[in-house]
């Protein structure tokens, strides 16, 4: 029994403790028949008259050793695991790079000073939470609440809040998305909060016009619930002109203009770039694009009433939405004044979409529609319009929606040197059949869309079913559009013959516009860290059965 007790105490110990621990050395001396301190097995048999006394002595020593070692192990673990405690005031005082940037999440405290400049959303976004809790901002930007983000944050943990300070967050983390509208269940959701979703490819090209309920949705912030009766659009007047405060009824008094326009997110098909190398952004597939018939007042008419005229200097029309984050920062963007004042550019302050008032997800009651330009400039829930000497200072204009070389990473990127995306390049994609589908031999119907920015018309779509060895020209469907005003996509279709012995098809599409711009054949040469402008040949692989 004594031998078992000895082993149960000693064998479980780390080697360093077995040799160096003072309690252990004393035990070995007490149990051993020699004076050596080497950890050899002691004799636990007794033949003299004092054997009972010696037995109890050894047992007591071993039990005492167990208590001492358990306490020693507890002290070691406690010294390693006991976090340092901080008060909310400690955290609050670390709210800038000079004092250090601390934040809290639950009861944990983090020093993120070294991460501020590395934050993918820009230092200014992270600094909003400096000296306080992350919860209100994670509730708003739910993409942060992911295991890999928490793992990254854990590297910066320095301690915990005092128990009395961690009972409740200093700011109520209420749900800013509680009043978001109900969405169509067919939409493929890329982000729930803020809501971002795309229609499934099989529905996307069912018709030339995308139905409102399945029009792709790109939100950056919670959807505001605006009263059309109290809504006002503020238009800053030109020097010598008059600023305007326009109700929805006032906008209806301007000449109504209608135009069919395709909107495409800069991140459409980003998921294909992610397969080459990790990028920052939502994993859009081929559905971050849709087409609608928009109606409203021409922006040039409204600006003219406020006294603005086209001038020689480089000026920009800045838009500000009524959606905002907890600090009151609204979504914003801008376009060149030359485009805004050109009647042929057909820029709208739209209040109708496919003959109906704008849905809430798409900007009710008023949004900007800029034909031929990236969706990021089509500001929704429009609240303010101004003409400035520089483009918008919004984060989404200055620090986002820009393209870079494949060699640029987050350590070398300089957003100030890259121009903001306005017109998008030629684009096409296959919507039918889908990747991995099974088709029958004989004849297969291949369908998709094609579009180019800046009003450039799609003049041809080439399709291959053998991985690019041979090509066939697809039939283009949709409205005929004026030269340089081809604001909407073309739906295309090809019926291809499939030999009975064919086991698979490697289908590719590529489009050409009226400037003879063509799509690049692969993704790697156009990869960029934001995953925007993804317009390589689109490819799907399908299986063929007899």
UniProtKB/Swiss-Prot annotation:
It comes from Mus musculus (Mouse). The keyword Oxidoreductase applies. InterPro entries: Cyt_B5-like_heme/steroid-bd (IPR001199), Cyt_B5-like_heme/steroid_sf (IPR036400), Cyt_B5_heme-BS (IPR018506), Ig_E-set (IPR014756), MoCF_OxRdtse_dimer (IPR005066), Mopterin_OxRdtase_euk (IPR008335), OxRdtase_Mopterin-bd_dom (IPR000572), OxRdtase_Mopterin-bd_sf (IPR036374). GO terms for cellular component: mitochondrial intermembrane space; mitochondrion. Residues 166-175 are annotated as: Hinge. This is Sulfite oxidase, mitochondrial. GO terms for molecular function: heme binding; molybdenum ion binding; molybdopterin cofactor binding; sulfite oxidase activity. Heme b binds at residues 119, 144, 146, 148. Residues 176-402 are annotated as: Moco domain. Pfam families: Cyt-b5, Mo-co_dimer, Oxidored_molyb. It is found in: Mitochondrion intermembrane space. Residues 403-539 are annotated as: Homodimerization. The gene is Suox. The modification Phosphoserine is found at residue 124. CDD domains: eukary_SO_Moco (cd02111). Keywords: Heme, Iron, Metal-binding, Mitochondrion, Molybdenum, Oxidoreductase, Phosphoprotein, Transit peptide. Catalyzes the oxidation of sulfite to sulfate, the terminal reaction in the oxidative degradation of sulfur-containing amino acids.
């Amino acid at each position: 029994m004594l031998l078992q007790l000895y082993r149960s105490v000693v064998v479980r110990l780390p080697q360093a403790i077995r040799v160096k621990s003072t309690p252990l050395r004393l035990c070995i001396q007490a149990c051993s028949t020699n004076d050596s301190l080497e950890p050899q097995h002691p004799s636990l048999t007794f033949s003299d008259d004092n054997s009972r006394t010696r037995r109890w002595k050894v047992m007591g020593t071993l039990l005492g050793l167990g208590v001492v070692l358990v306490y020693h192990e507890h002290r070691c673990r406690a010294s390693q695991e006991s976090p340092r405690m901080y008060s909310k005031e400690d955290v609050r005082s670390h709210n800038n790079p000079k004092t250090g940037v601390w934040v809290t999440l639950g009861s944990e405290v983090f020093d993120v000073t070294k991460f501020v400049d590395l934050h993918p959303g820009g230092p200014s976004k992270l600094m909003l939470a400096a000296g306080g809790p992350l919860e209100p901002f994670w509730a708003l930007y739910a993409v942060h609440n992911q295991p890999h983000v928490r793992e990254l944050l854990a590297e910066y943990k320095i301690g915990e809040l005092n128990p009395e300070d961690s009972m409740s967050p200093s700011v109520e983390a209420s749900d800013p998305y509680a009043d978001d509208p109900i969405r169509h269940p067919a939409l493929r959701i890329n982000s729930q909060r803020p809501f971002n979703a795309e229609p499934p490819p099989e529905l996307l090209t069912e018709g030339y016009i995308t139905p409102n309920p399945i029009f792709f949705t790109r939100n950056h912030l919670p959807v505001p619930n605006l009263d059309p009766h109290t809504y006002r659009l503020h238009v800053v007047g030109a020097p010598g002109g008059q600023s305007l405060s326009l109700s929805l009824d006032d906008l209806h008094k301007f000449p109504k203009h209608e135009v069919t326009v395709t909107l495409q997110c800069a991140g459409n098909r980003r998921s294909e770039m992610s397969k080459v190398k990790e990028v920052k952004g939502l994993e859009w597939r081929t559905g971050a694009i849709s087409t609608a018939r928009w109606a409203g007042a021409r922006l040039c008419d409204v600006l003219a009433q406020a006294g603005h005229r086209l001038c020689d200097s480089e000026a920009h029309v800045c838009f500000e939405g009524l959606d905002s984050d907890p600090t009151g920062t609204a979504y914003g963007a801008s376009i060149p004044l030359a485009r805004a004042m050109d009647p042929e550019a057909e820029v709208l302050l739209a209040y109708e979409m496919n003959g109906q008032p704008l849905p809430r997800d798409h900007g009710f009651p008023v949004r900007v529609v800029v034909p031929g330009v990236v969706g990021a400039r089509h500001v929704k829930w429009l609240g303010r319009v101004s003409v400035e000497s520089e483009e918008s200072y919004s984060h989404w204009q200055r620090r986002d929606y820009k393209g870079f070389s494949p060699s640029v990473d987050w350590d070398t990127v300089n957003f100030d040197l890259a121009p903001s995306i306005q017109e998008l390049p030629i684009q096409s994609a296959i919507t039918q059949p889908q990747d991995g589908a099974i088709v029958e031999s004989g004849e297969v119907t291949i369908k998709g869309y094609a579009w180019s920015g800046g009003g450039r018309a799609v003049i041809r779509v080439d399709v291959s079913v053998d991985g690019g060895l041979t090509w066939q020209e697809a039939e283009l469907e949709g409205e005929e559009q004026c030269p340089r005003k081809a604001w909407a996509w073309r739906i295309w279709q090809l019926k291809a013959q499939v030999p009975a012995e064919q086991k698979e098809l490697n289908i590719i599409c590529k489009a050409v516009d009226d400037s003879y711009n063509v799509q690049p054949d692969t993704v790697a040469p156009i990869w960029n860290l934001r995953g925007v402008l993804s317009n390589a040949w689109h490819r799907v692989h399908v299986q063929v059965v007899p």
